[in-house]
Swiss-Prot record:
Signal peptide: none annotated. Residues 178-206 have a biased composition (Basic and acidic residues). It comes from the Bacteria. GO terms for molecular function: DNA binding; DNA-binding transcription factor activity. Keywords: DNA-binding, Repressor, Sporulation, Transcription, Transcription regulation. Negative regulator of protease production and sporulation. This is HTH-type transcriptional regulator Hpr. It comes from Bacillus licheniformis (strain ATCC 14580 / DSM 13 / JCM 2505 / CCUG 7422 / NBRC 12200 / NCIMB 9375 / NCTC 10341 / NRRL NRS-1264 / Gibson 46). Residues 63-86 bind DNA. HAMAP family: HTH_type_Hpr. Residues 177-206 are annotated as: Disordered. SUPFAM superfamilies: Winged helix' DNA-binding domain. Homodimer. PROSITE patterns: HTH_MARR_1, HTH_MARR_2.
């Protein structure tokens, strides 16, 4: 590759990539700690909670979709999904017109746990939120991190970002804050699901 053709120098590339790497590492250490503390009362790990989150949003996600949107290996997605199934939080199924792929759905018990976790969220125990508060005080809103989202889009693709945006749009539209806690709106409860399933599912037979 002819580096002279690049619109940046090797030095600029190194400085940027290492800034991103080291800042991301520092940020993840804080995020990981807070995330683990949040879900600890429910005896879940981060991958398991992420799977519940994706299953709630997609309401019929394949294992490959769980792996893609959860940024984990397919075997990791499958193994943790099986553990969640054993606890009664997920059920495995097949689409009637797609017998090759295995899909997962939240059970009523799984949805109940997912909603309880959301309700238990405590902003005072989130270090990243605390770190962003000076910016909120200055600008009247939290950072929209559009530059980071653009980078992620170019790494993982439009599908990834579409599901990412949809999941937070669902939270925005279906939940409200009541007395300092997250609560699902009554009309969303009556609707019965977050995202409409486009193809019928049938349970897997053991």
């Amino acid at each position: 590759m002819n580096r002279a053709e690049e619109p940046y120098t090797v030095k600029e590339a190194l400085l940027f990539s290492q800034r991103m790497a080291q800042l991301s590492k520092a940020l993840w250490k804080s995020i990981e700690k807070d995330w683990q503390q949040w879900i600890k009362p429910y005896d879940l790990n981060i991958n398991e909670h992420h799977i519940l989150w994706i299953a709630y949003q997609l309401n019929g996600a394949s294992i490959s979709e769980i792996a893609k949107f959860g940024v984990m290996h397919v075997s990791t997605a499958f193994n943790f999904s099986k553990k969640l199934e054993e606890r009664g939080y997920l059920e495995f199924s097949k689409k009637l017109n797609d017998k090759r792929n295995t899909y997962i759905q939240l059970t009523p018990k799984g949805e109940e746990v997912f909603l309880k976790i959301l309700e238990s969220y405590d902003p005072t125990r989130n270090a990243v939120l605390k770190g962003a508060q000076p910016l909120h005080q200055l600008y009247g809103k939290f950072p929209e991190i559009v530059e980071m989202m653009s980078i992620i889009r170019h790494i993982y693709g439009d599908d990834f970002m579409e599901i990412f945006e949809k999941s937070f749009s669902n939270i925005e539209n279906e939940f409200t804050s009541e007395e300092g806690k997250m609560k699902k709106k009554q009309e969303a409860k009556e609707a019965g699901e977050s995202i409409e399933v486009d193809k019928p599912l049938e349970p897997l037979k053991n």
